[in-house]
Structures are given as C-alpha cells and as structure tokens.
Amino acid sequence: MIMDNFDSPFQYNRPEMTVEAIKKSIVYKLIFLIGRSPREASQRDWLNATLHAVRDLVTEGWITTARQTRAEDSRRVYYLSMEFLIGRTLSNAMIAEGIYGLAQEALSELNVDLEEVLEKEVDPGLGNGGLGRLAACFMDSIATLGLPGMGYGIRYEYGMFRQKIENGQQVERPDAWLEKGAPWEFIRPSKRFTVEFGGNIHFEGKKCIWQDTEKVTALAYDQMIPGYQNNSAATLRLWSAHAGEVFNLADFNRGEHLAALEEHSANKNLSRVLYPDDSTWNGRELRLRQEYFLVSASLQDILRRHKRTHNSLENLADKVAIHLNDTHPALAIPELMRILVDDEGFEWKKAWEMTRNIFSYTCHTLMSEALETWPVEMMAKILPRHLQMIFEINDHFLEYVRTYVTTDNDFIRRVSLIEEGYQRKVRMGWLSVVGSHKINGVAEIHSDLMVTSTFADFARIFPERFTNVTNGITPRRWLAVANPQLAALFDKYIGSEWRCDLSQIEKLKPFAQEKAFKEAVADIKFANKVKLAEYVKSELGVELDPHALFDVQVKRIHEYKRQMLNVLHIIARYNEMLTNPEKDWQPRVFILAGKAASAYYAAKQTIHLINDVANVINNDERLKGRLKVVFIPNYSVSLAQLIIPAADISEQISLAGTEASGTSNMKFALNGALTLGTLDGANVEILENVGEDNIFIFGNTVEQVEQLRREGYRSFEYYQNDAQLRTVVDQIIEGKFSPEDPQRYHQLLQGLQYHDYYQAFADFRSYVETQKAVDEKYKQRDQWIESTIQNIVNMGFFSSDRTIKEYAERIWKVEPVQLGD
C-alpha cells in the first residue's frame, strides 16, 4: 500500500500486516539486509531478518508519536536510569503489534519454527536486577499509555557479566550480547555530545570557568519500546562512550602506538560494563564517571530537544520533567545547575527553583549502604565544578533549615549533603531529596518507613514532597509473553482488555469455582513445570519431577534477601527426611537463581553453599527423588519468563523493613504462585489484595525487628536454643556439605552465629513451621488451585500501567498524546 499522508509529499510503501506480506518482508530482509540466501540461512539469520521485518511495523508509529508530541507541545518526562533490563525484543514486539500468529504462520510457510528462532535472541545486557526490570516495565507502560516520555541509559558493551558455575562457584564472564548484532536499535550518528571530566575551575567575578578537561564523546543508540496495539512507541536512548578524538595522531606518527590508543581505550571503558567492581578506588572512580557520563549526555540531549522547539530555556520547568530512578543519576541535579548558571547565565536562585521543579526521585532502598556516597576527594578530582555546585546547594539548603526549621547543630549535621568525618563524603540520596520536588517510595510500608527512618529529618523539612507510588509490572511481558497459554485462556473467558487494563482480570472471579476453568489453570501450570524440568535436565543434567512442589527463589543474591534462610530450611528438611524416611513427605524441588556482585564475598559464598548442598541432596538415593535442589545459572529476563510460570511457591523472604517493594512477588502471583514471605515491601499489599488464606506469611514484623535491635539481638542464643537450627549450622561448619574443604563456610556461618544483621536465625523457626503449612495445603489439590486462581484474579492493582498513571498525574504532570488510528 502506497501512503502519502504520513510524510507528504514523500510516498512510501507501508508494511502490511498479512501473512504473505510478513513472509515477503522477512525474505527480503534476509537477502538484502542480512546478505544470506534462504537456503543457507541459520536460525540466527532468520531471527535477525524477522527482527528487521517487525521493526519496520513499529517504526511508523514510533515516528508518529514523536511528531505528535512536538505538534502538541506536550510537557515531557525523561526517565534516567543506570539499568533497563528490557529482555528479548522480538516476542514482545510481535504481541504489541498483534502479529504473533501471523509471523508464526509466515515463518512456518518458510519451513522455519518461530519458537526455535526466538530462543536465538540474546537478552540485551542493559541491567541486572529489579531496578532495571522496573524501568523496562515503566517504559512499556509509558508507550502503551501514549505518554510523552523517553528513557535514557547506557549501552553497555558487556552488560554486567555472564554467570557461570564452575565447581559450585560463581565465575564472571563477559556478557558479549552485542557480538551477534543488535537489529532492533537505530544508531544516531548526529546525536553525539562531549562529556567532560577533571580539569580545574576558577572564578571570574561570579562566573565559574571549568577548563583543561578530559573529553569523551557520547554517541546515541535508540531502542523502540512499542505500545500495546496503539500504533505508538517510546524511545529508549542509550549512550555509548568514545574517545573525544579517535586517537592521538601526533603520538601515533611518532611511533607511540600504544600511547596513542590508550586514551581511546580508557574512554570506551565508560560504557563497557554495568556496575564495575567498586571494591577498589579505581573501580569507584569508573562508576562515578559512568554516572556522570549518563547524566551529562542525557541533559545535553534534553536541552537540545527543548531549544529546538522553544528557542529558550525560560520555560524549561513548564515543559520538562526529569525522573531519577534511584541515586545513580543524582548528578543530574548539579549538572543542570551548572548548565543553567555557567553556560546559560541564569541567576543562581532562579536556576535552583527551576531545577527543583524539574526533578523527581524514586528511593528504592532503606539500607544506608545502598544510598550512594562519594568521597569529596574523588569528586574534586573528577568533577570539580559539580563538587563546588553541591557545596553551594548545601549552603543554600542549610541556610533555609536554620531560618525556617531549626538551629540544632546535630540536626543540621544529619541533613547536610556532606558527611563529615575522617573521609568527607557527598550524600547522593540527600542531594536527590533536596533537589527534587517529589520523592516517592515504591510500596506503602516502604514509603512509611522512608519518612519515619531514612528520610525522617527531611520529612520534617519538606513533608509535602514525600509520597508513595506502589510498583507494578507489565502484564504484556509477564503474562502475554511469559505465559501465552494462560493468557489465551483468559482471552477466551473475558476477552483481551486485561492486557492493557489489568483491573479487568477480576472479571475472572465468577469462574474461580468452575471446574473446567480450574482444571485448565492447573493443566497450564503443569505444562509450564514440564517445560522448566526439560530445561533443567538439558542444561544441568538434574531430573525434576513436575508433580513435585516447585519452590522458587530467584533474585539478586544478597544477605538481606536471605537466601541463607532458604538454605537452612532445605538442610533441616533434608535431615528430617532422613530421620523419618517412611513419612508421607510432599516431594519438593527448590529452585534458586541470581547473580552475586563480583566483589561481594558473602553472596558468592552463599551460591557456593547452595551448590554444595544441591550436590549432596541430589545424589542421596535415600531420598528417592522426593527432594531436589537446583541453582540455575545466569538468571535473566528470558529465564524468568521460563521459571516464573512454573512456580508453585514464590519465596519473598527478606527481613521485614529491608525490601523496598519487590516486583518478582507480583510476577509470581500473577502467574498463579502462592507467596511465602515476610511482611515486607509489596508483600503487605499482596496480602491485602489476595487475602490471608491465599498467602503464607511468617517472621517478625518491622516493629519486632526494631525491638530486637534495640534490646540487643543475640543470634547465638537462637542457635543454642533451637536444636534443629543448631544441627544444621553445625553440619555446615563441620564440612558435611564440603568434605574436601571442611573450613569453607566457617566465616559465613560464624557471621550468622555472632552477628546475623538480617536476623535469619530469629525467623528460622517461624519459617520452618510455615513451610510445613505449605506442604499440607499443597496436598489439598482443590484448595491449592483455588488459591492459585485467587492470586491471579486479585492482581489487577499491580499493573505498571496503574503505577505510571499515578506518576504522570501526581508527580510528572504529563498527559497522553492524542494518537491517531
């Protein structure tokens, strides 16, 4: 079809959504873009050709969205995040465009299996955990709601790392996700900006001059994020680092070849790896440079876009909202101030008012170690002007506090942006609060704790700034893509509106007692368990019984997430099964996955212990296959899409008061897993929505945790007073699970015996008893299926569409673009 209304007077052939048109497009891309004959093409060639063909279908809506946003002169939101864990793009895009079945049929006519092709796509290495996946869900919702929004991140060449398990231990390998090509992205050669580091500053009157800097070039790559069947797409712009000059030609011509290329290589390091090891000073410096690289390039682009439309920055705060996803992009606050004051000539107080009205900030943690701080000495070397600007902001802020709040020196010391001490530090969480007009927590309990603990002093100063926006997940990715059989069942019963309005899923409630519906849900769950078992058998060589209860904990490995508590229970169960072999034990499969930060010794030791325990249990014939433990390496979005639909139990067992929200709890519940968890994060709201009969809650509450700390928590007393716990701990310490190295876990377990900051020992007994209740309920098949369905049908609140609507209305003040058909 020739179209001329989209870009008149230019004519073009609009891609058609028919089997024949898609088939022709794929073959055309294969021959003329990939350069392969259909007779010789590999599955990866077919993947890339299909990606290009589907990309064509998304592109027109993407361009139309951008054009309409400009035409309406809409206020726009820009979402800054160090991570965007977007997952595979092809299946998501085909569902968004409504062509999954058409593409499947088109490829089938070419004797190509779509499912096999999809498995060839590599997950983009753009994130690690929940922070990045949340950002990806948010971008999906921004596109689906037609909001004028754009994401900014870094195009990491090697991601975080590819996790291998060798001799039970995590080994980090480069995640070379780009080596097979990235057909979904558009390189933007004209969108390149200079990012400056180092140098020195001096004042000429009131004007600050930043000079003699080291320069790096940021080059843009765009990813389209398609909205769900609305002919719209949002932009995720990712920055790649390049040398300011390709290399020093003068050095090269003098024969100093390595010196000439050294700077080039060092500058490219800024976008090589997500979260470089920060256990060294150099690693910390690289991470600080990365964060500034992101915000500098992004702000230059944002201001360029604004000036293109308005020719002035006077109305910047009226037309631009910038959101900080955690503290990583917090340098955007002093960077915007620097640009407005130094480059654009704004008066300081006006620039500060504009800045505060532009920025908003999501706090994702209550743990002080996760709220970034940077040594003043380091920032003075790398970003001298920004450190000076932070000092100015701090002086202005503390003057306000003394004038309008209190002159108490202890209070002023606590809220200062600069932490005084042996090593002075810049508090990035504090900077984010002071420089933003809204600060939100991500679950009700988290937001309450945020204003009563972490940011209590700031809530006294700025009570109107703090709010809650509970996290959500996109049902397109986490049901339609991850669990297509279940999605099709829901379509059959209530239509497909739930895909873009998850509250519609409650329409399934009348069918919750219907035998045919219950059996269909149970059959789909079993089929998903079979699929996961086949993967584990193929990849790990471990045989799993899909009739067993699949108990799953998949998330970043961290002490506060308490994978150790899970392991302690697994060993306790193992001991009981050997003591009482004739008991009618519910068969269980414990599935764990997640990465440990490369420098996080305790987390890496936990992975080693899990694998040692798995090795002993899986090879103990006395268990007769009734207990299995598997650690699945290299957890990713794609693996999550395989694991989550197969889970019966979702382990959400962080210490109460430590998990801000969590979103895997929502994904599991939406796919019919029952939550086993503490009263932490979004577990509290899941409990409120699904009802206490359909969730397993254990452990101390936030208040009880704090009371234990106040009174002096002594973990060794729990060890002494609980015989079962004592046996388990002694077995690990004595080397039962590491006979070749009996001392292996001494340090790890002694840390629990004498410190146990996250109170695993305190919650152990409650956890073990609750696990027994899980067994009993699972044996009542009909009751279990009813609870499965109750979890699903009561998850309507936990959509990222609802979350983003709240951000748009209450924080960003942006409205949807009026999109045509």
UniProtKB/Swiss-Prot annotation:
Q: InterPro entries in the record, alphabetically? A: Glycg_phsphrylas, Glyco_trans_35, Pyridoxal_P_attach_site
Q: Which SUPFAM superfamilies match?
A: UDP-Glycosyltransferase/glycogen phosphorylase
Recorded E.C. number(s)? 2.4.1.1
N6-(pyridoxal phosphate)lysine PTM sites in chain numbering: K667
Enzyme class, broadest EC rank: transferase
Q: Which GO terms describe its cellular component?
A: cytoplasm
Keyword Glycosyltransferase listed? yes
Kindly state which reaction or reactions the protein catalyses: [(1->4)-alpha-D-glucosyl](n) + phosphate = [(1->4)-alpha-D-glucosyl](n-1) + alpha-D-glucose 1-phosphate
Family classification: Belongs to the glycogen phosphorylase family.
According to its UniProt entry, what is the function of this protein?
A: Phosphorylase is an important allosteric enzyme in carbohydrate metabolism. Enzymes from different sources differ in their regulatory mechanisms and in their natural substrates. However, all known phosphorylases share catalytic and structural properties.
The entry's protein name is Glycogen phosphorylase
Source organism of this protein record:
Haemophilus influenzae (strain ATCC 51907 / DSM 11121 / KW20 / Rd)
User: Gene encoding this chain?
Assistant: glgP
